[in-house]
Amino acid sequence: PQLGLPFPRV
């Protein structure tokens, strides 16, 4: 669960 750009990651 982490905020990853351009898509969220686990």
From Swiss-Prot:
**GO biological process assignments:** neuropeptide signaling pathway
Protein's cellular compartments: Secreted
Transmembrane segments annotated in the record for this chain: none
Output the Gene Ontology cellular-component terms. extracellular region
Instruction: Say if the entry is tagged with keyword Zinc-finger.
Output: no
Alphabetical keyword list: Amidation, Neuropeptide, Secreted
Report the superkingdom from the record: Eukaryota
Residues that bear Valine amide: 10
As for what it does, the entry says: Mediates visceral muscle contractile activity (myotropic activity).
Family stated for the protein in its record: Belongs to the periviscerokinin family.
The molecule here is called Periviscerokinin-3
